Amino acid sequence: MDRASVIIINYKTPDLTVDCLKSLSEMDVSSFPRIIVDNKSPDNSIDLISDYLNRNNLNDSVDLIASDKNAGFSSGNNTGINVSNSEFVLLLNSDTIVRPGAIELLVKTLEENPQMGMASPCLEWPDGRPQESCFRFHRPINELIRSAATGPITKIFHRYEVPLRVSDKVLYPEWTSFACVLIRSQVFEDIGLLDEEFFMYFEDVDFCMRAREAGWNIIHNPDAHVVHLRGGSSPVKSQAAKKKRLPRYFYESRSRYYYKHFGRFGLFRANIYWHLGWVVAMVRKLFSRNYQSNICEKQWRDIWTNFCNPAAPYIHPDNY
């Protein structure tokens, strides 16, 4: 059995994937085999990645899998997990650059803490500024906090805020970003793989919640550093920053998450809380030119996506 397998999902990001692979060059190939799963990219990703592997004699140490479908982030990772044979599995976004020693630190963290099921690094921008990567679980009340984006409401419900403050100390978050996370293989044996009905987004929150319910905890090691460029294959973060309309799959995943873990009434409460916050945001906007709203285009309608059937299979983006 290998010590840890590294799984990278590629979807139309061959240059990023190659750069990510280059950052792993210091790692012992015999102990850390790499698996790249291409989610049926419609471009020449396979050719470009294959060419890089050929030119650098990496075909024996990197397994490139061409999936016959693009079934999302969870499905791609599950494909890699199913062919791995290691004590630990590292899920790694293609838009990441691993700093020297980071993966070894994460592996040692789990080896020294057998009660921990997952370990996450400090995600950072290329200039070294840290990113939020440790969180509390999304609960219905969080929808009020986010949509209102108003100081007094945030202060009242601060203990429910999803992002944890960035810290240089060891943390034990409820969930962590899957841009880079090391998972003990025993966790998959205990709770199963990632839920493939989440096309993209909320699959990490869901997995961490299931893991915690099974008795596994998460540890964040701030001494391990990984650059996260963000948004390599998804427009959600850039669209949200511009307050543009978010893709349907985001709202499908949101509805599925709240329904799965809080029931239909929990999903209803989440949506009502969001609308209450929306009213607060509209009032704030009337009286303050400097107020920055979190409301995206048509979000008041899109949050009700799949409300009547939140467990329904997602609609593939190609079929919108």
Where are each of the predicted segments found?
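A short, conserved alpha-helix in the catalytic core of glycosyltransferases
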Residues: 166-168, 174-225
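Short aromatic/hydrophobic "clamp" motif used to bind/position activated sugar donors
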Residues: 89
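Glycine-rich, basic loop-to-helix element that forms the pyrophosphate-binding segment
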Residues: 66-84, 105
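Conserved donor NDP-sugar-binding/catalytic core segment of glycosyltransferases
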Residues: 97-134
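Short, acidic, metal-binding catalytic loop of nucleotide-sugar glycosyltransferases
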Residues: 22-31
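Short, flexible, basic/aromatic active-site loop/helix in glycosyltransferases
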Residues: 138-174
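Active-site-adjacent helix/loop segment of glycosyltransferases
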Residues: 7, 213-294
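A conserved acidic beta->alpha catalytic loop
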Residues: 23, 38-49, 69
